[in-house]
Regions:
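Catalytic-loop region of hydrolases
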Residues: 24-116, 420-422, 427-436
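Conserved alpha/beta-hydrolase
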Residues: 111-128
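A catalytic-pocket lid/entrance helix-loop region that shapes and gates access to the active site
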Residues: 186-243
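Alpha/beta-hydrolase fold active-site neighborhood
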Residues: 242-357
Length: 436
């Protein structure tokens, strides 16, 4: 057995080692050579891809504060998937970390539809693009847009055909903001499910959930579940506390209050991700069934000190805005007296709890969209609570198009629509790509 195993190991090595040596000895491609000659780019490494002929990850040197170069620099991660120098380029303005784009099977929708190169930019202060030391003062939307501007102007030395900016959720917001601040950097913008919030607790999401998503019967079923989980708090809170303890979660507020906020978050999470209503347990279900569903929809790490999104919470408090909770239907059963200003109290560390929301970004984007008509397509889901603060209010625009998928969630994409609508969107983008 040992001899057989040794032989198999040597046989595998005999095959793999020459392959690895051949790869190491392979001359650099034209793209590699041109990448190496670009300014501010370093640490270029090839990656495996099932969808693109060539794929690389590299870092680009960025200013922490473009208006004050003396503040220093950081390195931002970029993933480049290459189709051809004669093809258009899709710029993904990611709002978070870039980990998922490193997967060999990753392929962005627009890049696939239009056979385009793909430039995926990780957001500053996320993933491997975290400055050291971490100074939150430099985490601003404007600074992030200068990051994109530097990436785009640098890579346009390689790709001189049309550019499409796109992103999902916070990435979609970034696409919209980028077009506002640097309107000529790209030719087309396609933000997916992108909210434009006007305050820390915008105020449009709560009535949207209460009155507009799905049907009255389905909304009532979701609300009844929330009420039942609150009514059974004496039985379920110990299960909740053990669940959080086992996961290693800690919180800035008492566990009974965390429970309340998790219940309030339930309806937003349910509709955001399009969970089928028939998955909601009946109110006479046993405790275990209720609790299992509750945790499946609303993972409490969202409110914990271990939350994976501290950078986002800072931005929401400063510029991006967020949503509030309507406690009126549940007030009788809640430990908390009010949910107002919960992001500061629950989701920010004490040293950042005094952050003030600045409406400048919102006002600038609204003004830009009203006064201009860039080539943009907005994609939204009809049941997604973020659509409440989406850009669905523009009128009399020739170029800006808004598509809302009835019943759609935060996962809505072009491919989610019916065939006729998909063709309409693709035809419009193709026309823009082919315009001189």
């Amino acid at each position: 057995m040992k001899h057989t195993l040794s032989f198999m190991v040597w046989a595998i090595l005999a095959v793999l080692l020459p392959l690895q040596m051949a790869q190491a000895a392979a001359p650099p491609t034209e793209l590699q050579k041109r990448l190496q000659n670009l300014p501010d780019i370093s640490d270029i490494k090839p990656m495996q891809s099932d969808a693109y002929p060539e794929k690389y990850v590299f870092f680009i040197n960025q200013l922490l504060d473009p208006h004050h170069p003396e503040a220093g620099n950081f390195k931002q991660r970029v993933i480049l998937s290459h189709v051809g120098f004669d093809r258009p380029t899709v710029l993904v303005t990611e709002g978070y970390a870039a980990h998922y784009a490193t997967h060999p099977r990753y392929q962005e929708e627009l890049s696939k539809l239009f056979n385009a190169n793909l430039v995926f930019v990780e957001y500053r202060y996320f993933g491997e693009s975290m400055p050291k030391p971490c100074n939150w003062d430099y985490l601003t939307v404007e600074n992030s847009l200068y990051d994109l501007h530097h990436v785009t102007t640098t890579l346009k030395q390689l790709y001189d055909q049309k550019w499409i900016a796109t992103g999902i959720s916070k990435g979609g917001q970034t696409t919209m903001f980028y077009r506002t601040y640097f309107p000529d950097d790209v030719d087309i913008s396609v933000p997916y499910v992108a909210p434009l919030n006007k305050s820390l607790e915008d105020g449009r999401h709560e009535p949207f959930i209460a009155n507009k998503v799905s049907t009255p019967e389905n909304r009532k079923r979701a609300e009844n579940f929330q009420l039942e989980v609150l009514k059974r708090k004496n039985q379920l809170l110990p299960m909740f506390e053990k669940y959080c303890s086992d996961k290693g979660y800690t919180f800035r507020i008492p566990i009974a209050e965390v429970y309340d906020f998790n219940v309030l978050e339930y309806s937003f999470a349910l509709w955001q991700w399009g969970t089928p209503v028939n998955k909601i347990p009946e109110t006479d279900a046993d405790d275990h069934t209720l609790f299992k569903h509750f945790m499946a929809i609303c993972e409490p790490d969202y409110f914990s000190e271990q939350s994976p999104y501290p950078s986002f919470n800072v931005q929401a408090a400063k510029e991006l805005g967020y949503y509030g909770y309507d406690i009126k239907p549940f007030k009788k059963y809640l430990t908390i007296k009010s949910s107002r200003d919960y992001l500061h109290k629950v989701m920010l560390p004490p040293e950042l709890s005094n952050l003030k929301f600045d409406k400048t970004l919102y006002n600038k984007v609204v003004k830009f969209l009203k006064e201009n008509d860039p080539e943009m397509i907005y994609i939204y889901g009809g049941n997604d609570p973020w659509t409440a603060s989406g850009v669905t209010w523009l009128k009399n625009k020739k170029n800006i198009k808004v598509y809302v998928l009835p019943g759609g969630s935060h996962t809505t994409r072009i491919g989610s629509f019916d065939t006729d609508t998909q063709e309409k969107i693709k035809t419009q983008i193709n026309a823009w790509l082919n315009k001189e």
